[in-house]
């Protein structure tokens, strides 16, 4: 019998989400710092299936992008999609409800030096690193949303919650490194998850 809990598997964004329960269901945090989807998949049996939860939130692929050589990014993202699909089917095969979540975009590090470099980059017509990362995040997010609808999988669309009008991370929802999530960001996410994951 399922124990009624929700496991959250992901990387450091997931690891840092201080949510102990969602709608009175205990949340078991299995975020792993710096992990890519291949590493999440490798421990999925041990950290998700073996715990016999009611559902699993599968969230996070940004390290696949961070760690990839730009010249190989398309191959890497092909594998990212395969890894996410495999986690979904492993959960379903064990009677655990998979819940997919979109990745959040990033913003430049806060600081004058970063602002100046970003400005110079724009003048030179170069795509900034965060624009490159965010473009790839958006590509996979679009795939996740379509995949979720097509396969009737519940979705937590986290990206727009933390985004500014340009689709990058809003400053108030970012840690100073521009990548990790501020306490205010996590608060917004928790309220949203409670609303979205109410039992039908």
Task: Give a label for each model feature.
Residues 60-62, 103, 158-160:
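Active-site loop/turn elements of alpha/beta-hydrolase fold enzymes
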Residues 1-86, 90:
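Conserved SGNH/GDSL esterase-like catalytic core that processes O-acyl groups on lipids
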Residues 110-158:
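Substrate-gating cap/lid alpha-helix
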Residues 93-98, 153:
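A short helix->loop->beta-strand "cap" motif at the edges of active sites that frequently abuts
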Residues 22, 110-120, 164-172:
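Short, flexible, mixed-charge acidic loops at enzyme active sites
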Residues 72-79, 128-139, 173, 177, ...:
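Alpha-helix N-cap and loop-to-helix initiation/capping positions
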């Amino acid at each position: 019998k399922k124990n009624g809990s929700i496991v959250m598997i992901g990387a450091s964004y997931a690891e840092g989400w201080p949510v102990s329960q969602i709608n009175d269901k205990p949340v078991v945090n299995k975020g792993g710092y710096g992990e890519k989807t291949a590493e999440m998949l490798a421990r999925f049996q041990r950290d998700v299936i073996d715990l016999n939860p009611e559902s699993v939130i599968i969230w996070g692929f940004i390290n696949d992008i961070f760690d990839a050589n730009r010249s190989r990014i398309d191959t890497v993202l092909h594998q990212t999609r395969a890894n996410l699909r495999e986690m979904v089917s492993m959960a379903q095969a064990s009677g655990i409800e998979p819940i997919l979540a979109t990745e959040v975009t990033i913003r430049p590090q806060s600081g004058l030096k970063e602002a100046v470099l970003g400005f110079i980059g724009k003048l030179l017509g170069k795509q900034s690193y965060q624009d490159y990362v965010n473009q790839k995040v958006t590509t996979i997010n679009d795939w996740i949303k379509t995949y979720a609808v097509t396969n009737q999988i519940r979705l937590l669309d986290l990206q727009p919650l933390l985004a500014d009008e340009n689709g990058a991370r809003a400053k108030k929802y970012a840690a100073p490194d521009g990548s990790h999530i501020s306490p205010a960001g996590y608060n917004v996410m928790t309220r949203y998850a409670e609303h979205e994951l109410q039992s039908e």
